[in-house]
Design a protein with these regions (language model features):
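Serine-esterase "nucleophile elbow" of acetyl-processing enzymes
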Residues: 24-95
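Functional beta-strand-loop-alpha-helix junction segments that form "active/interaction loops"
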Residues: 93-105
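C-terminal motif of bacterial Sec signal peptides marking the signal peptidase cleavage site
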Residues: 16-19
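Extracytoplasmic/periplasmic mature domains of Sec-exported, cell-envelope-associated bacterial proteins
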Residues: 41-45, 51-64, 73-74, 105-107, ...
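Alpha-helical scaffolding within the catalytic cores
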Residues: 77-81, 107-115
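Alpha-helical cap/lid subdomain in secreted, periplasmic
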Residues: 110-266, 274-281
Length: 283
């Protein structure tokens, strides 16, 4: 029969062994730093035109990327960047805005090349308004040409950033803007200065020719959006189409600035961010 002291020693050694085993299986001690939610990127870049550049959203009428729906860092806009940063602080300081006021689809391949150089993990694309708006109806970019520019740009992204996520955003509904503002004195005055003439010239006219012109521009924007969706589908599973969310925004004149009654103000940029932000980064 073992002595009492032997029993005590064995019990103590067993307890120590169990404690050591438990410590070996324990996870690392908390560091105090929040863990990023799965899939949230640590860098991003925005491609496009004046809408994404935040043009007209500041007190002076210039590009204002800090208010951009995509990469904006200002408190006034709950941009994609700020939402991602809340979930993944590693993205802080790693958001570039390459959008240029006046850019058309023809400029997208060059922007895509710069995006590749940045090595961004998340890319947003909103392009096409200027292809419809930059001149008269006959000057609109042909649909086939538009698609060719998309394919070239997306090809560069797919080759240069094969693991990055791409979000393609639909062109907002410019015809709805005309519907909202054609009887607003401030909008009419602004549009007569040459804002998107293909759609907004002679804004108060009900002549058949003007109505037909507006219909043709609306149809062309629909065709561009169709090609954006198709190009994204052809890109593969690393591209997501917004499903027409931006085009479907039921906006009001309160969402555009009071200088040109065309570009989104801070509230409009927020609305774009709300409509297009991916709930999950699972693609």
């Amino acid at each position: 029969m073992p002595h009492r002291w032997q029993v005590v020693v064995l019990a103590v050694l067993s307890a120590v062994a169990l404690a050591c085993e438990g410590a070996g299986n324990a996870g690392p001690a908390p560091t105090g730093k929040p863990k990023p939610k799965p899939g949230r990127p640590s860098s991003m870049v925005a491609l496009g035109d004046s809408i994404t550049a935040g043009f007209g959203s500041c007190t002076i009428f210039v590009a204002c990327s800090r208010n951009s729906w995509a990469t904006g860092s200002a408190d006034a806009v709950d941009s994609h960047y700020r939402r991602i940063r809340e979930a993944n602080p590693a993205i802080k300081g790693h958001a570039r805005n390459l959008a240029v006021p006046g850019a058309q689809a023809a400029d997208l391949p060059g922007q895509a090349a710069s995006a590749v150089d940045s090595g961004a993990e998340y890319v947003t694309v909103l392009i096409g308004a200027n292809d419809a708006c930059s001149g008269g109806v006959d000057e609109m970019t042909p649909v086939r040409t538009f698609r060719g520019h998309l394919d070239k740009a997306f090809g560069r992204l797919r080759k240069g950033l094969p693991r990055s996520r791409v979000l393609v955003v639909s062109i907002p509904d410019v015809h709805r803007l005309w519907q909202l503002g054609h009887d607003d004195p401030g909008a009419v005055r602004a549009w007569r200065r040459g804002i998107c003439p293909a759609m907004l010239a002679n804004p108060t006219s009900t002549a058949a020719a003007d109505q037909d012109r507006r219909r043709r521009v609306a149809d062309r924007i629909d065709a561009y959006n169709d090609q954006l969706a198709r190009a994204c589908d052809a890109y593969g599973d690393r591209c997501r189409w917004d499903g027409g969310a931006a085009h479907g925004i039921r906006f009001s004149l309160d969402l555009v600035n009071r200088t040109d009654y065309f570009h989104p103000n801070v509230a409009g940029q927020n609305r774009l961010a709300d409509a297009t932000y991916p709930v999950r980064f699972t693609w």
